[in-house]
Amino acid sequence: MGEDAAQAEKFQHPNTDMLQEKPSNPSPMPSSTPSPSLNLGSTEEAIRDNSQVNAVTVHTLLDKLVNMLDAVRENQHNMEQRQINLEGSVKGIQNDLTKLSKYQASTSNTVSKLLEKSRKVSAHTRAVRERLEKQCVQVKRLENNHAQLLRRNHFKVLIFQEESEIPASVFVKEPVPSTAEGKELADENKSLEETLHNVDLSSDDELPGDEEALEDSAEEKMEESRAEKIKRSSLKKVDSLKKAFSRQNIEKKMNKLGTKIVSVERREKIKKSLTPNHQKASSGKSSPFKVSPLSFGRKKIREGESSAENETKLEEQVQDDHEEGSFTEGLSEASLPSGLLEGSAEDAEKSALRGNNSGVGSNADLTIEEDEEEESVALQQAQQVRYESGYMLNSKEMEESSEKHVQAAVLHVDQTA
């Protein structure tokens, strides 16, 4: 740029140089005078030369300016590209920084977790150390106690008797035992407990720690022995129940019941003893069948008999009447439906109560009056029952009984003292 400016100055001031050169030329010819025509021609040429020089300089300057502008444009374009590259690199750096921040957060979380775990582990290690220290102390105590026991040569032997069985008399419940029997049972229980207890064969010179340990073991064994006692007692109770409900016991009970059943000879006697005079017709409305009434005999007192004998005879008669009533009830229950059995049971209870009252009471007159309709219905039902059971009376006896029962039946019982 400085060179271009210097050249432009040179082109602008060529006249000055020419003027300086021209005065030097006319000096050798001082006598000659310049002509005006020559001066005019020279000035025109100089002007032309100056104009040409100026145009060239301007053209060159313009070219240089264009070149300079092109260079500036290229430089700007390069700068723009560099700026774009810088922006991309800056963005990459920012992304890398965000990733680094994320990694740092994750690492901080992991580090915090590791710190928490290390704290927990340290707490566990402390607890384990404390436990180990306590165990070491206990082991040292046990070693000392063991050494002392070995020095003294005293041992405690625990004997557990598994084979000793409990007698069955302990579990059998007797009805209201006396004081002596209660004492004997208490002594037996004490002896059993003593046999089941542990046997102490050591002296009392041992340390309290050993005694506590041995007492704990003894209590555990006692609890085991109690559980075994309960098991044995339950098994024995089950065996006793099985024996109670065995076939032999059931057969014995059935035999006892069979002896109570009325035999064939007794039935024949009951047939003969039945008379229509002493039959009592139950109400036809309440019960549909007839129950045999109680028979009250009237006997005279002989001279050699006492009142006690008369009472025994009356009781025997009452028992016979009860047996007859039970026999007739059984026959009626076998033949009639279950709906009719309720009336028979009620009539049997009423007749039994009347019989007992008649045997116990003193001089009493029992009067039984019944309607004709009720008696006829009762007689018909009694005939049906006896026909079904195979114990029918003869037609003549039934006619006589019907004729006698049409009238009101009155029974007088006189008990002599």
Curated annotation (Swiss-Prot):
What are the start and end residues of every segment in region (Interaction with CAVIN1)?
2-168
Where is the signal peptide, in residue numbers? none
Q: Which UniProt keywords apply?
A: Acetylation, Coiled coil, Cytoplasm, Lipid-binding, Membrane, Phosphoprotein
* InterPro entries linked: Cavin_fam (IPR026752)
What Gene Ontology cellular component terms go with this record? Answer: caveola; cytoplasm; cytosol; membrane raft; nucleoplasm
Post-translational modification, as annotated: The N-terminus is blocked. Phosphorylated on Ser residues.
Q: Locations of Acidic residues compositional bias? A: 202-218, 367-376
Biological processes annotated in GO: plasma membrane tubulation
Q: Which intervals carry biased composition (Polar residues)?
A: 274-286, 354-365
Which residues are recorded as modified (Phosphotyrosine)? 387
Residues recorded with modification Phosphothreonine: 195, 367
* GO function terms (MF aspect): phosphatidylserine binding; protein kinase C binding
Is the Transcription regulation keyword given for this protein?
Answer: no
Any Pfam family the entry gives: PTRF_SDPR
Give the misc comment: Binds phosphatidylserine (PS) in a calcium-independent manner. PS-binding is inhibited by phosphotidic acid and phosphatidylinositol. Does not bind phosphatidylcholine.
Domain-related comment: The leucine-zipper domain is essential for its localization in the caveolae.
Protein family according to the UniProt entry: Belongs to the CAVIN family.
Q: What does this protein do?
A: Plays an important role in caveolar biogenesis and morphology. Regulates caveolae morphology by inducing membrane curvature within caveolae. Plays a role in caveola formation in a tissue-specific manner. Required for the formation of caveolae in the lung and fat endothelia but not in the heart endothelia. Negatively regulates the size or stability of CAVIN complexes in the lung endothelial cells. May play a role in targeting PRKCA to caveolae.
The name this protein carries in UniProt is: Caveolae-associated protein 2
Upper lineage is: Eukaryota, Metazoa, Chordata, Craniata, Vertebrata
Q: Gene encoding this polypeptide?
A: Cavin2
